[in-house]
Protein backbone atom coordinates (compact mmCIF):
# COMPACT_ATOMS: atom_id res chain seq x y z
CA UNK A 1 0.00 0.00 0.00
CA UNK A 2 1.15 3.53 -0.59
CA UNK A 3 2.76 5.59 2.13
CA UNK A 4 4.63 8.90 2.08
CA UNK A 5 7.81 6.80 1.88
CA UNK A 6 6.42 4.87 -1.10
CA UNK A 7 5.48 8.13 -2.80
CA UNK A 8 9.00 9.49 -2.38
CA UNK A 9 10.42 6.19 -3.59
CA UNK A 10 8.16 6.14 -6.65
CA UNK A 11 8.95 9.77 -7.42
CA UNK A 12 12.67 8.99 -7.29
CA UNK A 13 12.26 6.06 -9.66
CA UNK A 14 10.06 7.93 -12.12
CA UNK A 15 12.47 10.88 -12.23
CA UNK A 16 15.31 8.54 -13.10
CA UNK A 17 17.47 8.94 -10.00
CA UNK A 18 17.52 5.21 -9.35
CA UNK A 19 15.78 3.68 -12.34
CA UNK A 20 18.81 2.16 -14.04
CA UNK A 21 19.73 -0.34 -11.34
CA UNK A 22 16.56 0.00 -9.23
CA UNK A 23 18.65 0.37 -6.08
CA UNK A 24 15.62 1.47 -4.07
CA UNK A 25 13.75 -1.77 -4.77
CA UNK A 26 10.76 -2.67 -6.90
CA UNK A 27 7.78 -0.37 -7.29
CA UNK A 28 4.28 -1.78 -7.52
CA UNK A 29 1.19 -0.76 -9.46
CA UNK A 30 -0.30 0.36 -6.16
CA UNK A 31 2.63 2.71 -5.53
CA UNK A 32 2.25 4.22 -8.98
CA UNK A 33 -1.45 4.77 -8.34
CA UNK A 34 -0.65 6.43 -5.00
CA UNK A 35 1.88 8.68 -6.67
CA UNK A 36 -0.59 9.62 -9.40
CA UNK A 37 -3.36 10.31 -6.90
CA UNK A 38 -1.10 12.64 -4.94
CA UNK A 39 -1.09 14.82 -8.04
CA UNK A 40 -4.64 14.40 -9.35
CA UNK A 41 -6.53 13.27 -6.26
CA UNK A 42 -8.77 10.45 -5.09
CA UNK A 43 -12.35 11.43 -4.34
CA UNK A 44 -15.84 10.32 -3.24
CA UNK A 45 -19.19 11.93 -2.35
CA UNK A 46 -22.48 10.67 -0.96
CA UNK A 47 -25.51 12.93 -0.84
CA UNK A 48 -29.07 13.10 0.45
CA UNK A 49 -31.37 14.81 -2.04
CA UNK A 50 -34.99 15.92 -2.09
CA UNK A 51 -37.38 13.34 -0.74
CA UNK A 52 -39.73 12.84 2.18
CA UNK A 53 -37.45 13.19 5.21
CA UNK A 54 -37.88 10.50 7.84
CA UNK A 55 -37.16 10.94 11.53
CA UNK A 56 -34.07 9.39 13.06
CA UNK A 57 -34.36 9.01 16.83
CA UNK A 58 -31.21 9.91 18.77
CA UNK A 59 -31.13 9.09 22.48
CA UNK A 60 -30.34 11.76 25.06
CA UNK A 61 -26.62 12.50 25.09
CA UNK A 62 -25.99 9.87 22.41
CA UNK A 63 -24.08 10.12 19.15
CA UNK A 64 -25.49 8.29 16.12
CA UNK A 65 -24.28 7.80 12.57
CA UNK A 66 -26.53 9.79 10.24
CA UNK A 67 -28.90 7.55 8.28
CA UNK A 68 -28.48 8.89 4.75
CA UNK A 69 -31.25 6.61 3.47
CA UNK A 70 -33.98 7.93 5.79
CA UNK A 71 -36.60 9.26 3.39
CA UNK A 72 -33.99 10.54 0.95
CA UNK A 73 -33.57 10.03 -2.77
CA UNK A 74 -29.82 10.39 -2.34
CA UNK A 75 -27.08 8.36 -3.91
CA UNK A 76 -23.39 7.70 -4.38
CA UNK A 77 -22.71 10.91 -6.29
CA UNK A 78 -19.20 10.09 -7.46
CA UNK A 79 -16.20 8.03 -6.40
CA UNK A 80 -12.88 6.62 -7.56
CA UNK A 81 -12.39 2.97 -6.74
CA UNK A 82 -10.76 0.11 -8.58
CA UNK A 83 -8.49 -2.91 -8.31
CA UNK A 84 -4.72 -3.15 -8.61
CA UNK A 85 -3.16 -6.64 -8.43
CA UNK A 86 -6.37 -8.04 -6.85
CA UNK A 87 -6.30 -5.33 -4.16
CA UNK A 88 -9.14 -2.82 -3.87
CA UNK A 89 -7.83 0.73 -4.07
CA UNK A 90 -9.21 4.24 -4.21
CA UNK A 91 -12.27 5.63 -2.44
CA UNK A 92 -15.74 4.07 -2.39
CA UNK A 93 -18.88 6.18 -1.93
CA UNK A 94 -21.28 3.90 -0.02
CA UNK A 95 -24.60 5.72 0.47
CA UNK A 96 -26.41 2.48 1.34
CA UNK A 97 -24.16 1.93 4.36
CA UNK A 98 -23.89 5.61 5.40
CA UNK A 99 -20.16 5.96 4.79
CA UNK A 100 -17.26 6.65 2.47
CA UNK A 101 -14.61 3.94 2.53
CA UNK A 102 -11.02 4.97 1.77
CA UNK A 103 -8.70 2.13 0.76
CA UNK A 104 -5.66 4.24 -0.03
CA UNK A 105 -3.17 5.48 2.53
CA UNK A 106 -2.67 9.22 2.50
CA UNK A 107 -4.19 12.51 3.61
CA UNK A 108 -7.77 13.43 2.72
CA UNK A 109 -9.86 16.56 3.10
CA UNK A 110 -13.34 15.78 4.45
CA UNK A 111 -16.33 18.10 3.97
CA UNK A 112 -19.75 17.65 5.59
CA UNK A 113 -22.83 19.78 4.98
CA UNK A 114 -26.32 19.08 6.38
CA UNK A 115 -29.71 20.81 6.13
CA UNK A 116 -32.00 19.54 8.89
CA UNK A 117 -34.91 20.04 11.27
CA UNK A 118 -35.98 18.44 14.53
CA UNK A 119 -39.52 17.21 15.03
CA UNK A 120 -39.88 18.21 18.70
CA UNK A 121 -40.08 21.63 20.33
CA UNK A 122 -37.40 21.10 22.99
CA UNK A 123 -34.26 23.20 23.03
CA UNK A 124 -31.57 20.90 21.69
CA UNK A 125 -27.94 21.44 20.78
CA UNK A 126 -27.19 19.17 17.85
CA UNK A 127 -23.49 18.50 17.29
CA UNK A 128 -22.44 17.23 13.87
CA UNK A 129 -19.23 15.21 13.89
CA UNK A 130 -16.86 13.83 11.30
CA UNK A 131 -15.71 10.41 12.48
CA UNK A 132 -13.31 7.76 11.18
CA UNK A 133 -13.10 4.02 11.72
CA UNK A 134 -10.04 1.90 10.89
CA UNK A 135 -11.08 -1.43 9.33
CA UNK A 136 -14.10 -1.98 11.57
CA UNK A 137 -12.30 -0.91 14.74
CA UNK A 138 -13.08 1.87 17.19
CA UNK A 139 -14.72 5.09 16.01
CA UNK A 140 -12.37 8.07 16.34
CA UNK A 141 -13.26 11.76 16.36
CA UNK A 142 -10.49 13.95 14.93
CA UNK A 143 -12.16 17.06 16.37
CA UNK A 144 -13.99 18.38 13.31
CA UNK A 145 -17.35 19.18 14.92
CA UNK A 146 -20.05 21.81 14.43
CA UNK A 147 -22.91 22.58 16.85
CA UNK A 148 -26.33 24.09 16.15
CA UNK A 149 -28.98 24.97 18.74
CA UNK A 150 -32.59 24.26 17.80
CA UNK A 151 -35.48 25.59 19.85
CA UNK A 152 -38.45 24.57 17.71
CA UNK A 153 -39.54 22.21 14.96
CA UNK A 154 -39.77 24.91 12.32
CA UNK A 155 -37.26 26.16 9.77
CA UNK A 156 -34.32 24.21 8.43
CA UNK A 157 -30.91 24.84 9.88
CA UNK A 158 -27.56 24.28 8.24
CA UNK A 159 -24.42 22.79 9.72
CA UNK A 160 -21.03 22.18 8.13
CA UNK A 161 -17.69 20.78 9.22
CA UNK A 162 -14.41 20.03 7.48
CA UNK A 163 -10.87 18.91 8.17
CA UNK A 164 -7.96 16.75 7.01
CA UNK A 165 -7.69 13.11 8.08
CA UNK A 166 -4.64 10.84 8.01
CA UNK A 167 -5.22 7.32 6.67
CA UNK A 168 -1.54 6.32 6.39
CA UNK A 169 -1.75 4.02 9.41
CA UNK A 170 -4.91 2.07 8.64
CA UNK A 171 -4.94 -1.71 8.31
CA UNK A 172 -7.05 -2.17 5.16
CA UNK A 173 -9.37 0.84 4.88
CA UNK A 174 -10.70 3.88 6.71
CA UNK A 175 -14.44 4.50 6.90
CA UNK A 176 -15.51 8.15 7.05
CA UNK A 177 -18.80 8.68 8.89
CA UNK A 178 -21.06 11.67 9.52
CA UNK A 179 -22.53 11.56 13.01
CA UNK A 180 -24.93 13.66 15.05
CA UNK A 181 -25.12 14.05 18.84
CA UNK A 182 -28.28 14.90 20.78
CA UNK A 183 -27.33 17.48 23.39
CA UNK A 184 -30.65 17.40 25.26
CA UNK A 185 -30.12 16.41 28.86
CA UNK A 186 -33.07 14.12 29.41
CA UNK A 187 -34.97 12.99 26.32
CA UNK A 188 -34.61 11.26 22.99
CA UNK A 189 -35.05 13.63 20.06
CA UNK A 190 -35.92 13.13 16.42
CA UNK A 191 -33.47 14.44 13.86
CA UNK A 192 -34.58 14.88 10.26
CA UNK A 193 -32.11 15.47 7.43
CA UNK A 194 -33.50 17.24 4.37
CA UNK A 195 -30.31 17.57 2.32
CA UNK A 196 -26.71 16.62 2.94
CA UNK A 197 -23.33 15.96 1.39
CA UNK A 198 -20.30 14.08 2.67
CA UNK A 199 -17.18 14.31 0.51
CA UNK A 200 -13.52 13.36 0.63
CA UNK A 201 -10.69 14.20 -1.72
CA UNK A 202 -7.03 13.40 -1.51
CA UNK A 203 -4.58 16.17 -0.72
CA UNK A 204 -1.39 14.17 -0.17
What are these regions (language model features)?
Residues 27-204:
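Extracellular jelly-roll beta-sandwich "head" domains, especially the C-terminal globular C1q domain
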Amino acid sequence: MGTPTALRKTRAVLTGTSFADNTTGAITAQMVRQFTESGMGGYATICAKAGTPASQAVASGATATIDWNAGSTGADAVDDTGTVSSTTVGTDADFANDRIRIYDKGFFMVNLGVSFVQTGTDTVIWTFRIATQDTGGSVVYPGYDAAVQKVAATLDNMASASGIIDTTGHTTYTDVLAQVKNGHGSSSENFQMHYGQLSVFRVG
